[in-house]
Regions:
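Short alpha-helical elements of helix-turn-helix
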Residues: 7-11, 31-42, 67
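Charged, amphipathic alpha-helical coiled-coil/dimerization segments
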Residues: 21, 71-133
Length: 142
């Protein structure tokens, strides 16, 4: 059976998200990181010293998922956490190993971006990215 076009926005976006994730995971397959983990490194490269909550908000994920993903990359020695403004808060940054992993995997990530654009078209990829970001920001705002 082939992929079905569904009448539901949620289901269709989830189909797309799974397909995109599979593409990126395939390209990153022999690395030690999953797409979700590389995304965390990418976010911390752009904005170091984010709190767990700020990282979750920035990525549009829940706190539990952020905590779990951060624990995995910390265990790999790619990020370090330091106390935040209160005892419960943790701030996260890349370690030198995290910086190196980010640089090492960046060409693969760019290859995944290119593969995505080749499969659906560059203009369509850009339009989808803009529409997805618009939806995420408007829906997150309530």
């Amino acid at each position: 059976m082939k992929l079905q076009s569904l009448p539901c926005y949620c289901a269709t976006l989830r189909q797309a998200a799974r397909a995109v994730t599979a593409l990126y995971e395939e390209i990153l397959a022999d690395s030690d990181l999953h797409a979700t983990q590389y995304t965390v490194l990418q976010a911390l490269k752009l904005v170091p010293n984010l709190t767990t909550t700020d990282l979750a908000v920035a990525l549009g994920i829940d706190q539990t998922t952020a905590t779990r993903t951060l624990a995995l990359v910390r265990k790999s020695g790619l990020v370090i956490d330091t106390p935040g403004s209160d005892r419960r808060e943790r701030c996260w940054a890349l370690t030198s190993a995290g910086e190196a992993a980010f640089r090492k995997l960046k060409p693969r990530w760019e290859a995944a971006q290119t593969a995505f654009e080749k499969r659906i078209g560059r203009a369509e990829a850009e339009a989808l990215k803009k529409a997805s970001y618009l939806a995420a920001t408007k829906l997150a705002a309530g």
